Amino acid sequence: MRHYELMVILDPSLDERTVAPSLENFLNVIRNDGGSVEKVDVWGRRRLAYEIDKQAEGIYVVLDLNSEPASVKELDRQLNLNETVLRTKVLRRVVEPRKAARVARAAAKAKNRPEASV
């Protein structure tokens, strides 16, 4: 399983309250293949940097997913076929190394170094 972040820009004519339930149909592609949806973050209506399909605004939604690459590709394909979706962008999320492990290694190195004489 890989970690992904998916940003979707939807048509602003949609009601913002119906955005998350309408995305659930698409997210079943991920769930049916054994993946999981960690977070659905609806940013709401925002102004676009440039017009897309003669729209100056869009409803932004950011999703955090754990899934196989084939499932994410199928989800992206289905979203692009939907007329209410203006744009999609799938990014592979980089998992940060644990800070605790880095701190422990640094402490171990400092402990093994001889004290400097003044």
Curated annotation (Swiss-Prot):
Pfam families: Ribosomal_S6 (PF01250)
Key words of the record: Ribonucleoprotein, Ribosomal protein, RNA-binding, rRNA-binding
InterPro entries hit by this protein: Ribosomal_bS6, Ribosomal_bS6_sf, Ribosomal_S6_plastid/chlpt, Transl_elong_EF1B/ribsomal_bS6
An annotated GO BP: translation
Keyword Transcription (UniProt): no
Gene3D superfamilies: 3.30.70.60
Cellular-component GO terms for this entry: cytoplasm; ribonucleoprotein complex; ribosome
Keyword rRNA-binding: yes
Gene Ontology molecular function, alphabetical: small ribosomal subunit rRNA binding; structural constituent of ribosome
Function: Binds together with bS18 to 16S ribosomal RNA.
Similarity comment: Belongs to the bacterial ribosomal protein bS6 family.
PANTHER family registered for this protein in UniProt: MITOCHONDRIAL 28S RIBOSOMAL PROTEIN S6 (PTHR21011), SMALL RIBOSOMAL SUBUNIT PROTEIN BS6M (PTHR21011:SF1)
Protein name: Small ribosomal subunit protein bS6
Species, as recorded: Saccharopolyspora erythraea (strain ATCC 11635 / DSM 40517 / JCM 4748 / NBRC 13426 / NCIMB 8594 / NRRL 2338)
